[in-house]
Amino acid sequence: MLFMCHQRVMKKEAEEKLKAEELRRARAAADIPIIWILGGPGCGKGTQCAKIVEKYGFTHLSSGDLLRNEVASGSDKGRQLQAVMASGGLVSNDEVLSLLNDAITRAKGSSKGFLIDGYPRQKNQGIEFEARIAPADLALYFECSEDTMVQRIMARAAASAVKRDDDNEKTIRARLLTFKQNTNAILELYEPKTLTINAERDVDDIFLEVVQAIDCVLKKKQQNAAAQC
């Protein structure tokens, strides 16, 4: 009888420890900022991401890089993704979300924050990201005029050793039109958590505005953590 009672006590203690650990992990995850980095090609968001990583030590995740890395790994999933892309098809949002979720899960224990670069590209992707992974704390939209982006893309293409058939003004403007339509829907839905930044200024001036926004997010996180203690 005493042995069975002891077992019940041990089991209850183990369950309480497990619940405490789950609560600790949930609070830790909630304390890690997630920031969406939005902007058209040539807007300079890559430069700003590098500066954010240098200052804050955040983890920079690009959906494109994750796809390429998975293909390069030679895994079963990588071979499946390669087959889809080689056929000219689009990788499903479920696959992209799965890669993002895996990357966030792997880095969550040591990361100070996450920059999700170039995602979401469509409104439904943002909705699914927040439902399946976590709510974004902030969306930074680096706004650039179409003419400026065209000039930057074409200059970058001219300097590249690899030439692409679609690096012409007509095709670029068509891509930018699609981007603008999709982005407008995202900005409308997530307006309360979005900061639109004029990306046609000096890099350091842009970064000052970025820093103010991120510092505000971090301050709120700290206040929430203190309130839970």
Curated annotation (Swiss-Prot):
It comes from the Eukaryota. AMP binds at S63, R68, G118, Y119, P120, R121, Q125, R164, R175. High expression levels in the thorax, suggesting a possible function in the gastrointestinal or reproductive systems. It is an enzyme of class 2 (transferase). Pfam families: ADK. SUPFAM superfamilies: P-loop containing nucleoside triphosphate hydrolases (SSF52540). Its EC number is 2.7.4.3. It catalyses: AMP + ATP = 2 ADP. ATP binds at G42, C43, G44, K45, G46, T47, R156. Gene3D superfamilies: P-loop containing nucleotide triphosphate hydrolases. One of its GO terms (molecular function) is UMP/dUMP kinase activity. Disruption phenotype: RNAi-mediated knockdown has no effect on viability. CDD domains: ADK. GO terms for cellular component: cytoplasm; cytosol; nucleus. Keywords: ATP-binding, Cytoplasm, Kinase, Nucleotide-binding, Phosphoprotein, Transferase. The modification Phosphoserine is found at S62. One of its GO terms (biological process) is ATP metabolic process. It is found in: Cytoplasm. Catalyzes the reversible transfer of the terminal phosphate group between ATP and AMP. Plays an important role in cellular energy homeostasis and in adenine nucleotide metabolism. Belongs to the adenylate kinase family. AK1 subfamily. This is Adenylate kinase 1. It comes from Drosophila melanogaster (Fruit fly). The lineage of its organism: Eukaryota, Metazoa, Ecdysozoa, Arthropoda, Hexapoda. The gene is Ak1.
